[in-house]
């Protein structure tokens, strides 16, 4: 006989097969009987195309000896890209570079720590810095500066992809580390993060909430679509086969990108095998021979395009993404925000513990903190964002584009995201010296010096 329990407003529960079941009785809130609206059908329809949480089960793992909860709260600005044009930038095509209003926000502890960097007179808000952060000093050698930071390097153009969302974010961390600025004035590495956590490990990711609002119009129709995905289920495309051919994360297309017949083989695939994010080569109508005669030809120039691919507006919409309309196209209210909530580890295997510092490591170095030893940069969830427009390039599939421009004294954000995240660290070690130093008292048994 199943145990039963009653709750207010006619809710009825029964305990069987190890858990409580809601019997879903009709509501008793109103005078007349109303059947419950079948809202789950709409959710089931969306999950048939994309399920952000395919399911999980709990694994019986030992609870930590002690825990510490870490909270993050802040804002992320999704801005348009900037460029510092030089003669050597993209082979002289710096004036013809275009970007798309896309973004990718990864939920991992590493990028949340980078988003809560120190705020100094040289802030990380506004994009990449020309060099590593300089707290004080103006000498050319690193050893002559405090705290031993490098000056901006010459002949380098600062750049970053839209996946580096933490560069345009302001995040607060609780509890705070009062010695973080003096210990890590520069951008923290995995080695620095491992030293800051010490013996703590990531026990679980509790919850992360996103609230996205479109802030800029792009014509008469420009909603911002956002979709939350589990882990790296929809990650960028990467070919290690051509790893030596896409330095600086840029590549050049070759024929037959435009559908023509090439007279030589290239490293690109035919048109039927290209994914939609790859742009076609712009055609060249006229050319000049060695004798100075201008002739017409059937050739095409090589288009520069980024190796990092993102979800287009049409793709996100087809997968059931939410839309947020900018002010002017819809009145601003709570419904103007896209709300996303990520709970748990986002892992169908139910794994809870994650290694921040490899076990048995006395001196934390970069070699120990590299993958797969450390899981600081393990992605639990990923939020994909793209803004649509009624006028776009065909291979962008409704995604808004813009021309890269020189930096000005203000940034141009097309969306803002409010973030709240809760993490929990754990420690398995018992705080007893006779347990930790057991080997020191027993290593000489039977052979005392």
From Swiss-Prot:
It comes from the Viruses. Disulfide bonds: none annotated. One of its GO terms (biological process) is endocytosis involved in viral entry into host cell. Induction: VP1 and VP2 are detected 12 hours post infection, while VP3 only after 24 hours. GO terms for molecular function: DNA binding. Residues 1-43 are annotated as: DNA-binding. It is found in: Host nucleus; Virion. Residues 6-47 are annotated as: Nuclear localization signals. InterPro entries: Capsid_protein. Transmembrane segments: none annotated. Homomultimer (Potential). Interacts with Rep; this interaction relocates Rep into the nucleus. Self-assembles to form the virion icosahedral capsid with a T=1 symmetry. This very small capsid (25 nm in diameter) allows the virus to be very stable in the environment and resistant to some disinfectants, including detergents. Essential for the initial attachment to host receptors. After attachment, the virus is endocytosed and traffics to the nucleus. The capsid protein binds and transports the viral genome and Rep across the nuclear envelope. This is Capsid protein. It comes from Chicken anemia virus (isolate USA CIA-1).
């Amino acid at each position: 006989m199943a145990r039963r329990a009653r709750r207010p407003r006619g809710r009825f529960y029964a305990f069987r097969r190890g858990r409580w079941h809601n019997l879903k009785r009709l509501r008793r809130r109103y005078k007349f009987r109303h059947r419950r609206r079948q809202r789950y059908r709409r959710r089931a329809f969306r999950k048939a195309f994309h399920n952000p949480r395919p399911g999980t089960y709990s694994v019986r793992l030992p609870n930590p000896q002690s825990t510490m909860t870490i909270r993050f709260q802040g804002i992320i600005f999704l801005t348009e890209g900037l460029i510092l044009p030089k003669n050597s930038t993209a082979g002289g095509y710096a004036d013809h570079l275009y970007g798309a209003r896309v973004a990718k926000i990864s939920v991992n502890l590493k990028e949340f720590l980078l988003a809560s960097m120190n705020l100094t007179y040289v802030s990380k808000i506004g994009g990449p810095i020309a060099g590593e952060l300089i707290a004080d000093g103006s000498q050319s050698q690193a050893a002559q500066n405090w705290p031993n930071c490098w000056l901006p390097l010459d002949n380098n153009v600062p750049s970053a992809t839209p996946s580096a969302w933490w560069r345009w974010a302001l995040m607060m961390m609780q509890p705070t580390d009062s010695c973080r600025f003096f210990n890590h004035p520069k951008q923290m590495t995995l080695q620095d993060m491992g030293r800051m956590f010490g013996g703590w490990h990531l026990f679980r990711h509790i919850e992360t909430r996103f609230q996205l609002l479109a802030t800029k119009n792009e014509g008469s129709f420009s909603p911002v679509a956002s979709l939350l995905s589990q882990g790296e289920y929809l990650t960028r495309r990467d070919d290690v086969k051509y790893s030596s051919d896409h330095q600086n994360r840029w590549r050049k297309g070759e024929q037959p990108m435009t559908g023509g017949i090439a007279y030589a083989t290239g490293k690109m695939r035919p048109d039927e095998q290209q994914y939609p994010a790859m742009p076609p080569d712009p055609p060249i109508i006229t050319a000049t021979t060695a004798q100075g005669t201008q002739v017409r030809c059937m050739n095409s120039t090589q288009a520069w395009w980024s190796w990092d691919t993102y979800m287009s507006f049409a793709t996100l919409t087809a997968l059931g993404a939410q839309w947020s309309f900018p002010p002017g196209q819809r009145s601003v209210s709570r419904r103007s925000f896209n709300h996303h909530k990520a709970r748990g580890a986002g892992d169908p295997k139910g794994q809870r513990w994650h290694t921040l510092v490899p076990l048995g490591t006395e001196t934390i170095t970069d070699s120990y903190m590299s993958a797969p030893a450390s899981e600081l940069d393990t992605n639990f969830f990923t939020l994909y964002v793209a803004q649509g427009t009624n006028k776009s390039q065909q291979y962008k599939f409704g995604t808004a584009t813009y021309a890269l421009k020189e930096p000005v004294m203000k940034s141009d954000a097309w969306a803002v995201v409010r973030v709240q995240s809760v993490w929990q660290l754990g420690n398995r070690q018992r705080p007893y010296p006779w347990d930790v130093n057991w080997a020191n008292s027993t290593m000489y048994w039977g052979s005392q010096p």
